[in-house]
Amino acid sequence: MLQTIYTKSVISFCLKLMSAAILYIVTVIVTRKLGKSESGIYFIGYSLTIISCEISRLGLDNVLLKRVGIHSGNQLWGGANSLLKTTMRMVVFPSCIVGGLIWLFSFEIAANIFSEPELSSTLSYFSLSIPFLAALTLLCIAFQGASHTFSSIILSSIMPPGILGIALLVLPIKTSEQTTIVYSFSIIFTFVVSYLGWIKAVPRGLESKSISVKTLLNESFPLLWVAVMSQGLSIGTIIILGIIEGADEVSQFVTAQRVSLIISFTLVAVNVAYAPRYAQLYSESNLSGIKSLSYSSTKFMLLLSIPIFLVLSVFPKYVMSVFGPEFAHSSHVLVILCFAQMVNVMTGSVGILLAMTNHQIVLRNAVSVTGIFSLLLVCILSYAFGLTGAAIASSLGLAAQNLFLVIIVKRNLGINTITFWK
């Protein structure tokens, strides 16, 4: 079993590394083709879309992941299918409402909040993708829970940016609006492929009695707040920086942020492979198995992350100059963000551990404290020091959140994720 999980982790890492490379290349293409201002407008619109989609999913991500993981581990495919159908129906209405509100008030948001009137049409096009992105995310999470790791990563992290990157290279795209139209098409197309892929790949099984919406919401609402506050560390920083400084600074921050995320793609890859197993082990009351898996995963992540961290930290100017000569000036931002991502990896899969072991209330409370602290710090330091302040604040917030969660995991599960060498 452990050998199988290691194999899945290696496959996940390779695929996530591929998706990181694609994201890096697409970011290079976007910044070079659109320029700093237009790419900044695109990144602001994208950030608002991601946080809107997060809200629309009602915190169902980890609920779906955990329950599908348990169902698939016991070969109860009818229950897994029934659960996916229920959760997808639940997100249709809120995602359409959120998308509709952004479309309706796109000019007011662009002109009055961000002081970027040209952002209006970009937001309008982004709003069309929100319902499809919400449904696509749930499908990819269901694939992950069913141990179809390859499909989950391909459909969530490789196909959409891949389509966008090819279109940017082939088509005469010069504006954020045109880029957004292609992005929305890539999401809709990938959703259709994902839905058909789920039907083909997953056995039908006997449909089990549907879990009530009330039960799912009681479990998911604490995780909704966790998801929103977690996004506040990354997406929230982009939005706040956009309001205070404008599109040019956003473009530099997002570029550095996306590069630094290459370090923690190992964490994402391991979580994709291990999360369903954590849920199954907890359902069997096997805490020693969870501890062993947690320690081995942290060692694996560090082994792969440290070389990436060293390259990005030693050669930041060279890495950032690839996006354009004007981006080399923000190389210090990349270094700051890289240290935060290294802390993220060193503390292990603390959030996933709590979410997969029915500690979502504790997770919500912990993330609320650190999330509010982080957002306040981002506002203060962004206003005082601009781009550099935003990078410092978001990095301190991410490090504080992960170290706090280490304490929470130790208290509730008896596992100290940073003593993995023992």
Model-derived segments and their meaning:
Residues 24-39, 110-113, 231-262, 281, ...:
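Helix-terminus/linker motif at the lipid-water interface of multi-pass membrane proteins
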Residues 30-51, 120-121, 215-219, 223, ...:
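Interfacial/gating helices of multi-pass transporter permease domains
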Residues 106-126, 247, 295, 314-342:
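Interfacial segments at transmembrane-helix termini and the short loops linking adjacent helices
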Residues 132-155, 338-369, 409:
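Membrane-interface junctions at transmembrane-helix termini in multi-pass inner-membrane proteins
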Residues 1-5, 176-182, 192-234, 277, ...:
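Interhelical loop/hinge segments that connect adjacent transmembrane helices in multipass membrane
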Residues 58-74, 145, 260-285, 291, ...:
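Helix-loop junctions and terminal segments of transmembrane helices
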Residues 124, 153-201, 369-373, 387-411:
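Hydrophobic alpha-helical transmembrane segments
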